[in-house]
Amino acid sequence: MLIVEGVRIAEELENLPKEVRIFDTTLRDGEQTPGISFTKEQKLMIARQLAKLGVASIEAGFPAVSQGEFEAVKAIAREGLGPEIVALARANKRDIDKALDADVDAIHVFIAASDIHLKYKLRMTREEALRRAVEAVEYAKSHGVTVEFSPEDGTRADLNYLYTMVEAVVDAGADRVDIPDTVGVMTPTRMKYLIKFILPAAKGRIVSVHCHNDFGLAVANSIAGIEAGARQAHVTVNGIGERAGNAALEEVVAALEFLLNVRTGVNTKLLYETSLLVSKITGIPIPPNKPIVGENVFSHESGIHVHGVINNPFTYEPIQPEMVGQRRRIVLGKHSGRHGVEYALKTLGYPTDPDVVLRVLDEVKRLGDMGIRVTEDKLREIVEKVLEERERAKEAATS
């Protein structure tokens, strides 16, 4: 459903794909969030939810990291969930063998491409890294699995070298090539340029984007890459991940589906449910103002806004909350107006006589000025008091 009426920019994006694969890496890159470590049971719970959600790929983990990680990845692979199950591996036979032993459908092979990583982390020349990348892809492909390749820190690599590496691994048999913005330094304009530059090297294979959020641009960069022709996005639920996190699954999917009319295969009505599950398991709360899944996203307090939303929700909401599994909330406070109170009273089954509405509104504003939040229970208390006082006044008038 395209919800931007009157805007046809998407139709002018000649490289915009009609469908995009959602590659979820919550269980791998998301688990690299400082302080987060999933048990096998927790990984299985999240994997089942991701399958229910409808992602194309689930990166279940990095089998070479530990025996527990290996067992968790293997358990997920044996669940028969539906999505492609992927394991991460460095560009060496040991890691690839471990991934193969985990019975996964695909192996995500990576090696550094930027000079800073090659010099200070791997202590390796460009030529050596290129040779290892090609050998690793050939080795993995020889075992009959799907292979995705990532030139780590690709957005800081020399462009010509990056092009050469992508072309070489594609010639070696890579099925997909992912471009990682490892430290989140891209901007949407630069990401579009980079993806357009790399596409010829991929020779028709799927190009993917993997964006980190160090400057708050992970989602924007992911969308920009897709607008330029990338056909897959790496994401995590709630945007969890190391440092500032990754591109948030719920935000990328919603933007693609509702702003660009690009199909993702994801059941958007399960986005909120999925977000809550991951938040509960990780212990990381969802910020109230987080796009798509935050509590405030479909909440309204301002009298002008509430009046508009009651008459037509699209006055102050870009999509219906039910489209992402959310619900609308009318919040009462000092910014509230008569229509908001009337709506709240009607929702709770109370009379909406003008005198009751105005007296409740006065009390709501008084409490708001004191910094007191009017919860549903507090509102009931206020209404009951107003109704009680009205009855006493009636009795006094007739006595």
Swiss-Prot record:
Keywords annotated in UniProt: Amino-acid biosynthesis, Branched-chain amino acid biosynthesis, Leucine biosynthesis, Metal-binding, Transferase
GO MF entries: 2-isopropylmalate synthase activity; metal ion binding
Pathway stated in the Swiss-Prot or TrEMBL entry: Amino-acid biosynthesis; L-leucine biosynthesis; L-leucine from 3-methyl-2-oxobutanoate: step 1/4
GO BP annotations listed: L-leucine biosynthetic process
Subunit relationships: Homodimer.
Family that this chain belongs to: Belongs to the alpha-IPM synthase/homocitrate synthase family.
Domain Pyruvate carboxyltransferase: 20-272
Chain positions recorded as a divalent metal cation binding sites: 29, 210, 212, 246
Record's function text: Catalyzes the condensation of the acetyl group of acetyl-CoA with 3-methyl-2-oxobutanoate (2-oxoisovalerate) to form 3-carboxy-3-hydroxy-4-methylpentanoate (2-isopropylmalate).
Domain of life assignment: Archaea
Pfam families per UniProt: HCS_D2, HMGL-like
Protein known as: Probable 2-isopropylmalate synthase
InterPro entries xrefs: 2-IPM_HCS-like, AIPM/Hcit_synth_CS, Aldolase_TIM, IPMS, LEU1_arch, LeuA/HCS_post-cat, PYR_CT
